[in-house]
């Protein structure tokens, strides 16, 4: 059974009173799994962590939206399941020790592996409670090193789906729908193929963000570093770039244009808009990088066990890194 010391931040999740005996039994499989809470309080209700809590304006979110919600939520490790409540500990604050969690992902977790959390793909650990209309879906545990490839393939697959639904010709490789690790593969079809409106909104936002970041980055380099195109530099790497004999560099070297001041488009003298735009570009680039960066939530530590690999459904000791 999952357990933790009193130094952990303990949370009680109240269960509805009209659950059937069969539903109570099925809830017991949640022991050792991780639920994501929108806020951190000592007492929560089941509807705070069920699938409906991720809905946006009454519609089910796509995978990218669920992933963004995971970044804002707090992971709770379920330590015990009672008749009236779930006992859990927070992995975000406090000093939980002696943790025991369940591997809810398809990949093996090795001793010393960092473990990240993503929205579930497939219904392997889904618990449907018809009596109260709730669906509980624990987070999927995956090795942190697999996370970046998995997220990249999900977004690439969503891009292909976006092109297909908008009659944009594009070749779709079969490998975009699966990610493999240690001779085990995970099918990403369910995460990639969402609703039409959700996919349209998500991909348009993603494309706009990427294009804006690329355009702003080039604009800042051209504005703040005109000497890079016109003159030399003592840095060997920059000299190698300047010796590429591009048409832009040659024309700038011949004419040697003066550096022109960039005025504030609003006409005010309170700020220099190029530096504000540069700061905004750095912020957006950082956020795009954060989308693909998986932070570890747990680290597998098997002190007194001969087992070195934890398969799906098995439990393992862990610490918070």
From Swiss-Prot:
It holds the Pfam family Herpes_V23. Keywords: Capsid protein, Host nucleus, Virion. Disulfide bonds: none annotated. InterPro entries: Herpes_capsid_2 (IPR002690). GO terms for molecular function: structural molecule activity. The keyword Protein biosynthesis does not apply. GO terms for cellular component: host cell nucleus; viral capsid. It comes from the Viruses. It is found in: Virion; Host nucleus. Coiled coil: none annotated. Interacts with TRX1 and major capisd protein/MCP. Belongs to the herpesviridae TRX2 protein family. Structural component of the T=16 icosahedral capsid. The capsid is composed of pentamers and hexamers of major capsid protein/MCP, which are linked together by heterotrimers called triplexes. These triplexes are formed by a single molecule of triplex protein 1/TRX1 and two copies of triplex protein 2/TRX2. Additionally, TRX1 is required for efficient transport of TRX2 to the nucleus, which is the site of capsid assembly. This is Triplex capsid protein 2. It comes from Psittacid herpesvirus 1 (isolate Amazon parrot/-/97-0001/1997) (PsHV-1).
